[in-house]
Amino acid sequence: DSVPLYYNDVRNFGTFKIALSKNALDKKINSLGPDFLKDGWGPDTFYNLLKKKPNKTVAEFLMNQKNVSGIGNYLKAECLYDAKISPHRFCCHITTKESDRLFYACRRIIQLSYQTGGATIQNYRKPNGKKGLYSQRFAVYNQKTSPCGNEIIKEQTLDKRTTHWVPAVQK
């Protein structure tokens, strides 16, 4: 049976590849870092992964799907804010306590985003045509002030993406 496949990437951030064999698919999947939505790994593994990238900023680390998978730009901003970590910090300077905070922030925020259908940014829609509701919960991404009233800075970080962050909170 033939099944139509639709791919709409209005923001031009995505890629679409077709694996022609199970081996090709397995190779790609095995190249990805651990998924925050899956059990079987935890804060100790996360800390060890961070320490393997001492010369990368935490923003670069989170956005590289070979390190950890499932984090995009809005999740990066929200998770770093929740963990109170600056996107400019290098992985080698992240303490165990900070790494634990970041791991649990990522897991919690990604789960909540997934449960609420993701974030509708611009004209994004889920396959059923509905908007994701997580954008209504943004603390810093696309906001002017943080929940505690601090100014949010928007700047390009070393991951080459615009990052929303709060210097008064994130150290």
PLM region spans:
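Structured catalytic/nucleic-acid-binding cores of DNA maintenance enzymes
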Residues: 1-171
